[in-house]
Amino acid sequence: MKPVSELFNNRTGSSNTLWSVTPDDTVFEAIKVLAERGVGALIVMEKGKLVGIVSERDYTRKIALQGKNSKESLVRDIMTANVLVVNPRTRTRECMAIMSEKNIRHLPVVDGDTVVGMLSIRDLMNDIIRDHEFTISQLESYIKG
């Protein structure tokens, strides 16, 4: 399978944009960004450093289901601080294994100390579908001669 960097090279438009919040933003502000941008998770940055990740799942479990107020709660209260990351050279198969084993849907992609992207389970599934469609097309061409 291909490296993560190849997946990112095939992205277009806003799917290449990296969305972030700070630990001191309210959960409401984070949820608003998630909804406006149509993404499932945001990186949490503080002083230029990756300090966490916050997802729709975090909001649901730690705010909505506990009856807390998203306008009064901070991102730092619900974010995952011990973030699993991959680098641009990590193979997509390994990313899929990490996501499956850890039951997560997003992985920040870090090159050195710089966050260069966010990989989602959707990215991986779309890539698998494209690969399968290509294989089918090649097989059909071979069969037809």
Language-model region placement:
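Tandem CBS (Cystathionine beta-synthase) repeat/Bateman regulatory domains
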Residues: 1-145
